[in-house]
Amino acid sequence: MHPKIMVVDDEPDTIDLVKIILESENIQVIGASSGFECLELMELEKPDLILLDIMMPDMNGWETFHKIKERNPALPVAMLTVKSQEFDKMLGLHVLKADDYITKPFSRKELIKRTRDLLGTKAG
């Protein structure tokens, strides 16, 4: 069975780009355009990994991250964001304990490698 990831981003182009890249690697991609949609779809779709934007209207990525972890502490969540300052990375990785912190723009190779690393043995 192919691994399934959810991309949560209010920019449809980002979801489409991730989908094109990862589906070429036999990784199923579900898009969600908000934190609220992510939380709804999470129960239904049961993703193996969530790639989560930080800057979104209504519920930002940090709030969404906390709600995801409350519901499913073992589910890997990587931040996928334009916020590339060292402070933001430290906050994401060391304070909030995100599983990874991927900054936009990312390369195809980087996204595939980091997604596979996060999925562990499920990818391939």
Range-by-range predicted roles:
Residues D16-S24:
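Charged docking surfaces used in two-component/phosphorelay signaling
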Residues S33-E37, N60-E63:
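Acidic catalytic/metal-coordinating carboxylates
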Residues E63, S84-D100:
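Alpha4 helix (beta4-alpha4-beta5 surface) of REC/receiver domains from two-component response regulators
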Residues E45-L51:
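Active-site beta3 strand of CheY-like receiver
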Residues M56:
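Receiver (REC) domain active-site loop signature in two-component systems and cognate sites
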Residues N26-S33, L41:
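Short hydrophobic/Thr-rich beta-strand motif most characteristic of the beta2 strand and flanking loop
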Residues P105-R116, A123:
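C-terminal output helix
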